[in-house]
């Protein structure tokens, strides 16, 4: 129990003094020489992956802004002279300093992440960074599970909750006060001029979100790590205890005293957790009763410990054999494949019916058509229309845009078990391209295709389509069979909008 209590009472050695580089502002020149402080761990910070933030700020500018704020005498400025221009100048101050604050705070998190992998002999693999790398794992593991919890991660509405989340990691009170001051001032000016979206600071709020989720996952993973097997002692179930609804300031004491009861509830050897796009899924081989207990555990954890109002309706319990669950643009479900095997022993023969469970991932075509309709590629029914906003571009530019979008969609949804919906999306983009070019040249679609021939549509063939056409030019059965094979690419690091693929 002492080691559990030592873990729950956050170690003071992990707390950091973040604001000292700002106070001793002469040392802030170190930031300008290090280019984002990402070389300390020989790896890029986890908060900077696939983000082009290095070009959007300058530490030297922040240095000068801090000097100006120190030299400025705010007492001699009357209130009536605070016009809009001065307000935007102050907003620029807060924005730049908040960026630098996020850079400084990221350092211990990055170092802590690097130290956690030391001694584990993990090889660097860029394939594990791909979004598609999770799907082979799901196909291998989820076929043995029964239920999946689909949960939307709540985010605190009040700013003070975000400040309190970082209080365990911050040693000096000045850092906490400075963080609170910048956060409130920045949000006030953002609400004052909400039309200018370009002034938003994604790096600062990305750090807040990651720190919020990291705090939640540290508790959840600790409980999961200590679990091994479910015990059947009903009186130790934690959710039925009145002490759980005690005051928040006494939560740690209640948590430690009832620790065996919590582990008695959560002990499950088959449990997998995946977080993505502000959501997470929890797959397990359990009973409906246990899934409901997991559901209310998350609700009570968010409400009592993180002071975030969280409704149980935001947690969906999906039975894999009956329901579909949405995951990264796919609809996934378990399919039962019957395999009949004939076994013969001497003069007797037997028919053995084996049922295999296989995870199928299909395209959610309604959402893709909705995205295409929103960007004026088709109407809400999926009928292609001409792209009027691209009329001023050259023919080659228009064709390249459509081909790039079509190939990106085919590249991402190549793992679908049924390619019929994917072919429909390709058809919409092809016909939209032809209608756009025909409208630009003031011609009909039929006349335009007759003049250019079918070579125009061959540009939409993806790499795998061209390979299949070369390997199986005559065998229709083999070609159709290979077209049903799912392909997962390990070079997709992030998702962009369908139209803005570069």
UniProtKB/Swiss-Prot annotation:
Domain of life from the UniProt record: Eukaryota
Keyword terms of this UniProt record: Chloroplast, mRNA processing, Plastid, RNA-binding, tRNA processing
Q: Does the keyword Plastid apply?
A: yes
Query: GO terms for biological process?
Result: mRNA processing; RNA splicing; tRNA processing
Q: Where in the cell is it found?
A: Plastid, Chloroplast
Asked whether the UniProt record includes Plastid among its keywords, one would answer: yes
Coiled-coil regions, chain positions: none
> What is one term from the GO cellular component aspect held by the record?
chloroplast
List the molecular function annotations (GO) for this entry. Answer: RNA binding
**InterPro entries membership:** Domain_X (IPR024937), Maturase_MatK (IPR002866), Maturase_MatK_N (IPR024942)
- Cited function: Usually encoded in the trnK tRNA gene intron. Probably assists in splicing its own and other chloroplast group II introns. Binds its homologous trnK precursor transcript.
Can you tell me which family this protein belongs to? Belongs to the intron maturase 2 family. MatK subfamily.
Q: Which HAMAP family match?
A: MatK
Quote the protein name from its UniProt record. Answer: Maturase K
User: Source species, please?
Assistant: Sinapis alba (White mustard)
What gene is it encoded by?
Answer: matK
């Amino acid at each position: 129990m002492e080691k559990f209590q030592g873990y729950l009472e956050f170690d003071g050695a992990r707390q950091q003094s973040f604001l000292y580089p700002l106070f001793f502002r002469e040392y802030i020149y170190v930031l300008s020489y290090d280019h984002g402080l990402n070389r300390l761990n020989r790896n890029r910070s986890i908060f900077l992956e696939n983000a082009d933030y290095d070009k959007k700020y300058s530490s030297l500018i922040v240095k000068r802004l801090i000097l100006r704020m120190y030299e400025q005498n705010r007492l001699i400025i009357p209130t009536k002279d605070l016009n809009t221009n001065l307000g935007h100048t102050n907003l620029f101050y807060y924005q730049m300093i908040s960026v630098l604050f996020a850079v400084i705070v990221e350092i211990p998190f990055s170092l802590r992440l690097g130290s956690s992998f030391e001694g584990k002999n993990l090889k660097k693999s860029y394939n594990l960074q791909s979004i598609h790398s999770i799907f082979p794992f799901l196909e291998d593991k989820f076929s043995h599970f029964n239920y999946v919890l689909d949960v939307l991660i709540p985010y605190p509405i009040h700013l003070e909750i975000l400040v309190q989340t970082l209080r365990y990691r911050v040693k000096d009170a000045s850092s906490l006060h400075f963080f609170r001051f910048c956060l409130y001032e920045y949000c006030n000016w953002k609400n004052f001029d909400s039309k200018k979206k370009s002034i938003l600071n994604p790096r600062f709020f990305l750090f807040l979100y990651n720190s919020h989720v990291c705090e939640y996952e540290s508790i959840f993973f600790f409980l999961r790590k200590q679990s091994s097997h479910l015990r059947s002692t009903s009186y130790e179930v934690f959710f039925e205890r009145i002490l759980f609804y005690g005051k928040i300031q006494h939560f740690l004491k209640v948590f430690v005293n009832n620790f065996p009861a919590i582990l008695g509830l959560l002990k499950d050897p088959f449990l997998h957790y995946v977080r993505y796009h502000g959501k997470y899924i929890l797959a397990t081989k359990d009973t409906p009763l246990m899934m409901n207990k997991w559901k209310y555990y998350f609700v009570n954890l968010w409400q009592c410990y993180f002071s975030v109002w969280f409704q149980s309706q935001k947690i969906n319990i999906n039975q894999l054999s009956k329901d579909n669950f949405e995951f990264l643009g796919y609809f996934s479900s378990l399919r039962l494949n019957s395999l009949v095997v004939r076994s013969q022993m001497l003069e007797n023969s037997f028919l053995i019916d084996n049922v295999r469970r296989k995870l199928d991932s299909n395209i959610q075509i309604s959402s893709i058509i909705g995205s295409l309709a929103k960007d004026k590629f088709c109407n809400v029914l999926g009928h292609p229309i001409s792209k009027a906003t691209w009329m001023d571009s050259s023919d080659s530019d228009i064709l390249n845009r459509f081909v790039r979008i079509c190939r990106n969609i085919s590249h991402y949804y190549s793992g679908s078990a049924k390619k019929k919906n994917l072919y429909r999306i390709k058809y919409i983009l092809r016909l939209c391209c032809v209608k756009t070019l025909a409208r630009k040249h003031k011609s009909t679609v039929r006349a335009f295709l007759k003049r250019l021939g079918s070579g125009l549509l061959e540009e939409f063939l993806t790499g795998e389509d061209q390979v299949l056409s070369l390997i199986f030019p005559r065998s229709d059965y083999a070609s159709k069979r290979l077209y049903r094979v799912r392909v997962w690419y390990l070079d997709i690091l992030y998702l962009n909008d369908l139209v803005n693929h570069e």
